């Protein structure tokens, strides 16, 4: 199993898990051509695409994917409706999946999980989207993987994981400094802290809401161009978790096998 990182920023997000005979595309925020290139132009091996939410950097290319491939494209009902409201005829091509249910896409198994917190005031989403999801993904070559982005926390505790892809978007002190310098305005600051995961929150969620016992690697995704420090993020997450930590960069290919040989 290999993980191809095509894009992992506000410019566009796209990842491919490539097994021996199949592949799974995560997000539709990068050109389809880049996905094809990552797969050596063998787009036919793709079993499906999963989308977390409707924002352009995660789903802006979905029409292109639907028009030029036959892969099923999966999203929540809310995400599908939000995307369809922007593009005529789009809804018919999307596959709606439900939170907590198991689905099979070729050799891959996925369990979507709504990014929602339930409290005394009811439920609320942890990103400013219609119905955002994170996903558990399983394949015999890699074991279980958690993919969670564009959220300030995880919705529950996750166990039995071999790898984790998790957003680490900003550091609070860097964000505060950039606000003071006028690099980031207050409106953007307020949205960032209520829709994205900080370094401190990332460490907290990893150490409190995931069982790290069998985790082989943690990949930090969706870092901010202005408010992150990749080297620092890698050091601090590694120190807190004791795990191998990789900061996602476009063009990377990472060995994602569950076993070393």
Language model region names:
Residues 17, 27, 53, 73, ...:
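Divalent metal-coordination and catalytic microenvironments
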Residues 101-167:
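Catalytic core of the metallo-beta-lactamase
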Residues 60-128:
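Glycine/small-residue-rich loop that forms an oxyanion/phosphate-binding "nest" at active or ligand-binding sites
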Residues 7-8, 28-30, 54, 78, ...:
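Active-site metal-binding loops of divalent metal-dependent hydrolases
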Residues 1-41, 131-150, 163:
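Conserved beta-strand hairpin/beta-sheet module of binuclear metal-dependent hydrolase folds
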Residues 158-250:
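Cap/insert and terminal regions of metallo-dependent hydrolase folds
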Residues 31-79:
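Active-site metal-binding motif and surrounding structural segment of the metallo-beta-lactamase
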Residues 55-59, 81-83, 153-156, 171, ...:
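Active-site environment of divalent metal-dependent phosphoester hydrolases
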């Amino acid at each position: 199993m290999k993980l191809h990182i095509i894009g992992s920023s506000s410019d566009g997000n796209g990842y491919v898990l490539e097994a021996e005979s199949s592949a799974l595309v995560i997000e539709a925020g990068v050109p389809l051509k880049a996905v094809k290139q990552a797969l050596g132009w063998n787009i036919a091996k793709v079993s499906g695409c999963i989308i977390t939410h409707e924002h352009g950097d995660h789903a802006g290319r979905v029409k292109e994917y639907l028009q030029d491939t036959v892969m099923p494209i999966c999203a929540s009902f809310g995400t599908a409706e939000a995307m369809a409201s922007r593009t005529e005829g789009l809804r018919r091509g999307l596959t709606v999946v439900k939170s907590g249910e198991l689905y099979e896409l070729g050799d891959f198994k996925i369990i979507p999980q709504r990014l929602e917190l339930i409290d005394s005031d009811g439920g609320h989403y942890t990103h400013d989207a219609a119905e955002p999801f994170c996903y558990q993904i399983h394949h015999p070559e890699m074991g279980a993987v958690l993919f969670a982005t564009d959220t300030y926390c995880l919705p529950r505790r996750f166990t039995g994981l071999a790898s984790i892809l998790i957003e680490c978007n900003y550091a609070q002190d860097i964000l505060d400094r950039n606000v003071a310098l006028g690099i980031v305005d207050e409106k953007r600051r307020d949205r960032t802290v209520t829709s994205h995961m900080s370094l401190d929150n990332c460490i907290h969620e990893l150490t409190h809401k995931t069982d790290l016992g069998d985790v082989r690697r943690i990949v930090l995704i969706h870092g901010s161009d202005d408010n992150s420090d990749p080297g620092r993020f890698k050091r601090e997450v590694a120190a807190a978790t004791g795990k191998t930590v990789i900061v996602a960069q476009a063009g990377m290919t990472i060995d994602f096998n569950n076993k070393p040989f």
